[in-house]
Amino acid sequence: MAIAYLQEFEIQNGDTSTTNYDAIVTAVNLEDVPDGLLIHTAGFDHDAGVFRIFDVWETREQGEKFINDRLNPIIEPIAAAAAQNPDSNFAPPNREIWYELHDSMTG
């Protein structure tokens, strides 16, 4: 069964731009679709006060491989630079979970 991966980032200082997300997506080059990725979504949930990323993967191992091999090498230097800048709105997710899906459909 497919695996869901959810990340939620608290909206920082009222900033609802997608500058950080867009820069990371450009650097990761998602035109080269990661092996095992079935769907990727990202957007604001203003009621919850978060920017939410929701992915569905064939297996957790495929998702973790993408995160470790392609995503983290891009995020780690950005996070290190942001930690030195008190005005930065870059923050790690305040919620991050994996869970097995009972069912999924595409239309």
PLM region spans:
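Short S/T/G/P-rich N-terminal loop/turn motif that feeds into the first structured element of a domain
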Residues: 1-72, 83-107
